[in-house]
Amino acid sequence: MNLLASLAMIAAFSVAPVPRAMAADFYAGKTINFIAGTDTGGGFSIYARLIAKHLGRFISGNPTIVVKNMPGAGGSTAATYLYRAAPKDGTTILSVSPNAILGKLLDETQSQYDPTRFLYLAGAEHGTRLCMTFQHSKIRTYEDALAQKAIIGATSAGSPTREYAAWHKHATAAKFEIVSGYKGPPDLFIAMERGEIDGVCGLDWSALKSQQPEWLRQRKLNLLVQDSIESQPELAALGVPTPWRYIADDIDREAVALMVSFQQAFGKAYLAPPGVPAEQIKTLRNAFAGVLRDPELLADAEKLRIEIAAQSGEEIQRVVEAAYAAPRNVVERLKKIVEP
């Protein structure tokens, strides 16, 4: 997997020293709209609300931070708004799925924005995504999914739940029947519990620990596979395999590696629209660097059972640029295997 090194190495991070934010006069008395490009209850919304609770203290002028959810098209609705309509003055920031950023690489007509032109502020977590089934399902291991049909629920086109289920279906020959149209993780959880679906792919491990701690404690979930370049320690201890042993074709392995590496490196990233003055971008990057190592935020994260792994905005910017420089044959194959 020769793509792994370049993208995985970018995922390594260091947090810059945090001077007091500048531009106090600009942010004093202002409101920063913090948009989460998902429904409430999902991992991106949970992280956005946690960070918003503490972020204002790290910006001179102590602006009010208001979180607004803007779901749709796997995050592309919110990204389009940020790119085309949001104020370009540093008062609007976005938390969005990596799929909304990678989407234009897979379909140049898909989005109305150029992901390489966004101004990336920080990252809060390296995501490890999972395929799982509920306790009553006959599909208890990934080997079961290779041998018999599993009904896998998903949200909208372009979402991790749909694209991850699709590439598993095509690259490993998992017998997944994908049912799209669920509103978000809460609806998927209800569908699993009711037996409408066997399970779901593309959910984030850190968010799952916050959303369904009792299910995990009571072992109500069968964790089939962890979509990770290197095995996540907690999941490895639970015996959850990575997907690489199940992918026979070399180009398929490279295509899946491109998506998984990008998703893990990008994680929970935060961005501003192109055109925001450099002074405001510096202020926001410094603020994120500070808040993501703040003891109060980290204590709240522990209560929520979510992980914080800070990255700088500059590192996220390089992650995006590296993905868009990937070999065309790998990109073309990825385009095919993320469609159900």
Language-model features and meaning:
Residues 10-21:
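C-terminal segment of classical bacterial N-terminal signal peptides
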Residues 22-24, 68:
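Boundary of Sec targeting at the N-terminus
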Residues 26, 32, 57-62, 81-92, ...:
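Hinge/capping helix and adjacent helix->loop/strand transition within the periplasmic-binding protein
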Residues 28-32, 217-219, 223-224, 246-248, ...:
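An extracytoplasmic/periplasmic, membrane-proximal ligand-sensing/linker region
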Residues 33-48, 71-74, 153-160:
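Extracytoplasmic "Venus flytrap"
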Residues 51, 73-75, 90-103, 123-125, ...:
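Ligand-binding clamshell of periplasmic/extracellular solute-binding protein-like
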Residues 62-80:
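Early extracytoplasmic/lumenal segment of secretory-pathway proteins
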Residues 71, 153-245:
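Ligand-binding pocket segment of bilobal, Venus flytrap-like solute-binding proteins
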